């Protein structure tokens, strides 16, 4: 199962703008603004859309009583207990705070969250790979606000991912119908949870069936499982990592992969061995 981190693990909104998050101090969580109290009571009712409520909680300013010497205590409903390397936390937090000093950027950031984000929770692995791009001073994310926001939003499934919004990776093949990316293991100083082996993703360049791309993917990925999970690209998974997936996840992936192949009959010859291996 994918490990998650929250936007509130990094920054918290206040009346004077955004400040660093202090997850360690839990005693001050009792202090709430009137709006935060109402949101907490609504959140307790399991019938409500909790993902939407978490977004509202993040965008709700915290009162000064939640301030500590290190930052602001986030509401317990929107933080995680994920063990995060300090290098990852510092890099992402500093980048966000520097970006949000500009009022126009802050307004666009909040509009993006309220209109596109399905939740404040992100994939820890995706965010770690995003941080690797921030670490690279030559990366275009450091120079283009729009591209940076799209790449950041992709970590939260806020936009449909493309090869341009992916985290740190290498282009290893380019055919007439697709681009293949290689994702190497995340360095320990950025990694949350268990390490993942090298895997690959295929991004089609059009709506046509990427036959040549699939042949190239099969060549570079070797004996890895191919899966389609509904995000517009095909991903490989090393077979030993299938053991970490739940039965529910495996059934869902198999169903989506078979649906994909039913609409792309020419690819059956290339990838059918991977689908059948799950029987």
From Swiss-Prot:
The active site is at residue 233. Its cofactor is Mg(2+). One of its GO terms (cellular component) is host cell cytoplasm. Its EC number is 3.6.4.-. It is found in: Host cytoplasm. It is an enzyme of class 3 (hydrolase). The keyword Nucleotide-binding applies. GO terms for biological process: viral genome replication. Residues 214-249 are annotated as: RNA-binding. It comes from the Viruses. One of its GO terms (molecular function) is ATP binding. Keywords: ATP-binding, Host cytoplasm, Hydrolase, Magnesium, Metal-binding, Nucleotide-binding, RNA-binding. Its main location: host cell. ATP binds at residues 119-121, 201, 229-231, 235. Belongs to the rotavirus NSP2 family. Participates in replication and packaging of the viral genome. Plays a crucial role, together with NSP5, in the formation of virus factories (viroplasms) which are large inclusions in the host cytoplasm where replication intermediates are assembled and viral RNA replication takes place. Displays ssRNA binding, NTPase, RNA triphosphatase (RTPase) and ATP-independent helix-unwinding activities. The unwinding activity may prepare and organize plus-strand RNAs for packaging and replication by removing interfering secondary structures. Homooctamer. Interacts with VP1; this interaction is weak. Interacts with NSP5; this interaction leads to up-regulation of NSP5 phosphorylation and formation of viral factories. This is Non-structural protein 2.
